[in-house]
Amino acid sequence: MRGLIQTRLLETGTLRTALFLSCYGRVFSSVSDGKGKVSYRERLRSGIVDIKEDDAVDLFQEMTRSRPRPRLIDFSRLFSVVARTKQYDLVLDLCKQMELKGIAHNLYTLSIMINCCCRCRKLSLAFSAMGKIIKLGYEPDTVTFSTLINGLCLEGRVSEALELVDRMVEMGHKPTLITLNALVNGLCLNGKVSDAVLLIDRMVETGFQPNEVTYGPVLKVMCKSGQTALAMELLRKMEERKIKLDAVKYSIIIDGLCKDGSLDNAFNLFNEMEIKGFKADIIIYTTLIRGFCYAGRWDDGAKLLRDMIKRKITPDVVAFSALIDCFVKEGKLREAEELHKEMIQRGISPDTVTYTSLIDGFCKENQLDKANHMLDLMVSKGCGPNIRTFNILINGYCKANLIDDGLELFRKMSLRGVVADTVTYNTLIQGFCELGKLEVAKELFQEMVSRRVRPDIVSYKILLDGLCDNGEPEKALEIFEKIEKSKMELDIGIYNIIIHGMCNASKVDDAWDLFCSLPLKGVKPDVKTYNIMIGGLCKKGSLSEADLLFRKMEEDGHSPNGCTYNILIRAHLGEGDATKSAKLIEEIKRCGFSVDASTVKMVVDMLSDGRLKKSFLDMLS
């Protein structure tokens, strides 16, 4: 930008072409001076509202070439116009060129400089300009101080802003509402919302009347941080203080309440604002619809959609997509399809989220042909599928045991510029593991690592489980030991897989050692861990140890579940201990559980070959 200015300053002569004059005529609503040429003074005084960079530079050039030189008020007017168009860096460059031309600043040009410096986060330069003001013998006014205070607050330097307020007061300047609003905003940006509220209360005590600008940042931070109860209290306080409310303030709190899951409170506030004469807009409706949909309350979401349409507020793609996704999750695919048709009839184009939700619905219903058709449709409409779209469809193929089709889609998606993520690889690896195609699964895992797609805890669980289930527990243990040494945080789920794999490989003693070491690793066993270990001990024939562990799990705060009881009942039946099994059956009933199909089958088989009395069967009912 500076280079552009310097280049223009090297140019000589008057305005260069008729085309250029024509441009000025359009931009500045120029007035002729009788010679066909419009002076810079007339341009500046004609009330410029907007100005482009090139035009500002050219006008500045003309001003610096003029003799006698323009007054500083004319430069101030130009800088103000450029600043209003948010070309702050350009203003600073023009100010620099003015200095190089030997044109001294005054209070107004320096104040404009300070404002621009603060706007583009150049605070050191802003304070340098402040120093020039004092050096030239001017006294900074309240506006200048407030500008610097706001700049400090936007940078998160609130303590320095407060010090500057003290200095401002010492110099005899009283802070204005603009000053205090800047401080409130700064405190909120730093997450100090309680301090912001205290400052507002002090403002009121000292005679200041806060306005809607004061409260806006506080409400936003409160709602963003989940402090919606405090936001509601503040709203009531605003009403008491006769602060002007609007739909935006209600929208902030409604959004916060929806994100907190307080949907009924959000809906009550929605009704309250309507009663008070504030009309809900598309943003508020969409916020509520999404909130209800995420909570599974599709009926309330659908009612709001109909209410929108009734009030002539056209729902957008976000509202329709939220409802379609909710219908899919609730298993209401037909309703989702109907809503998709309706949005098209209303001229609303579905987006990636819409199509992806419908593809998800078709995959869940095993309608893969329709899912593929929807994928083709979205591409034909110029709507690009994302990684989630492909992950859903690949998962659909895997669930339908069409793993090769899933792999083919996986290879094709890279041609569309979509990069596979951890979920993509996890889905395919699990699919191949479940089909017993362990070599392909291992190859995919290696490909995942080589392509720098970082495996997560789920990736390792899938791989370790696949290795254990497909007869490679040693390889699973080798990988497990590596990740245990890494910085990855392991949960009880991954330990359960390894303990289960060891038990199935008849390495019950090793499994027991790992089980006993869990507390030392800072990992708490869950009911599944106990069930696996009890099952392993039973499989080994160590029923007394299994019974002891069964009682110990209760002491450790883990109540046995139906699976625990069934494991022990079958183990004792297998050892011919009908009495112990009978006691466990009575206990399982008291706990509200029931014997499972495997236990019933075992009892029936034992009855048929005479190993149990027929009276034992009555105990199961």
Curated annotation (Swiss-Prot):
This is Pentatricopeptide repeat-containing protein At1g12620. The lineage of its organism: Eukaryota, Viridiplantae, Streptophyta, Embryophyta, Tracheophyta. One of its GO terms (cellular component) is mitochondrion. Belongs to the PPR family. P subfamily. PPR repeats lie at residues 36-70, 71-105, 106-140, 141-175, 176-210, 211-245, 246-280, 281-315, 316-350, 351-385, 386-420, 421-455, 456-490, 491-525, 526-560, 561-595. GO terms for biological process: RNA 5'-end processing. InterPro entries: Pentatricopeptide_rpt, TPR-like_helical_dom_sf. It comes from the Eukaryota. Keywords: Repeat.
